[in-house]
From Swiss-Prot:
Magnesium as UniProt keyword: no
Top enzyme class: lyase
Family recorded in the similarity comment: Belongs to the cyanase family.
Single GO MF annotation: DNA binding
Catalytic activity: cyanate + hydrogencarbonate + 3 H(+) = NH4(+) + 2 CO2
UniProtKB keywords: Lyase
Name recorded for this polypeptide: Cyanate hydratase
Length: 147
């Protein structure tokens, strides 16, 4: 099963059941962003997690098995995103990527922020001038090793 067909199958099942990613988070105990990443072929479910989702969404055996495969992460096309919301993240990194890198290295030293030992939370912040999106990323700092 391709990532595109897996995503289409999962999204159709979620829609048919009238569920949101927040509903799935509550039902299986995994964060809604992580569940969404699973739907887009960017995460791997354990057998138990895949079976819970299969029960909730009435998934067949092939789809349930595909949820447990190890994905090729970060393989979304095209390289420069064209979806307006996703492009904003690309634009944010174009504008703030180097400044963030410098500030992080001033605080922690030479290294990177893990996207493996990592969480991301999305919240809605009510504002009279227009609601705001609040995204909090929390990744373990990994210093570069000298040898």
């Amino acid at each position: 099963m391709t990532v595109m067909s897996l995503t289409a199958t999962l999204m159709a099942a979620k829609k048919a059941k009238g569920m949101s990613f927040a509903d799935l988070e509550a039902a299986i105990g995994l964060d809604e962003v992580w569940v969404a990443s699973l739907f887009y072929g960017q995460a791997t479910a354990s057998k138990e997690e895949a079976e819970k989702l299969a029960g909730l969404l009435s998934l067949d055996a092939e789809t349930t098995a595909a949820l447990q495969e190890y994905p090729t992460k970060g393989s979304l096309e095209p390289v420069i995103p064209t979806d307006p919301l996703i492009y904003r993240f690309y634009e944010i990194m174009q504008v703030y990527g180097m400044p963030l890198k410098d500030v992080i290295q001033e605080h922690f030293g030479d290294g990177i922020m893990s996207a493996i030992d990592f969480t991301i939370d999305v919240d809605k912040v009510e504002d009279p001038k227009g609601d705001r999106v609040k995204i909090v990323m929390c990744g373990k700092f990994l210093p570069y090793k000298k040898w």
